Amino acid sequence: MRIPAHQFFTHEEFQSRLDGVRSRMDERGLDALLLTTPENIYYLTGYQTPGYYYFIGLIVPLSGDPILIPPPHEESLVASYSVVEDYRLFADTESPLLGIASVLGELGLARSSIGVEYDSWFLKIREYMLLRSALPDARVHDGSGLVETGRLIKSEREIEYMRQAANIATAGVQSGLDAIAVGASE
């Protein structure tokens, strides 16, 4: 793992999260997992995207380093936020899913058991079909829930962030209540 410019969790925490996902992948007999949900990608990498309108992917092999597939115009954010060392960019004119199929082939996973987040709002049917046609010998399974299961159990750092957020929200609500008065504008 690399050290990004802005890191909100320790390397040990990211590694623990990755280990948990891999354990659940192994239980389901998956050799790789393709994540397309930005929150799940953030959970494993620290990578934050401002653009939910572009494809973002993360390939998590059962062994070996994960590979991030960010939009090309967000390359600078990889250095700023992601702990993942290996990332691949694909031009806006290319299909990132065909690129992902190529990377899976590079990793020797084109004929393996691959989990895909069927519940993701961020994988279009057309993209999924492109992936399937590019990997005709792969056994594709539902990988939904493998990350979310780990996200249910909060670390000490996550709990601390939640407490800080609650304190900020409480202060904001109190300020609003204090500002309420007859004739006051919004």
Regions found by a protein language model. Name each.
Residues 176-180:
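Short regulatory/linker helices and ligand/cofactor-binding micro-motifs at input modules
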Residues 1-171:
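A composition/biophysics-driven feature that prefers long, compositionally simple stretches
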Residues 183-186:
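Short, intrinsically disordered, charge-balanced linker/junction segments flanking boundaries
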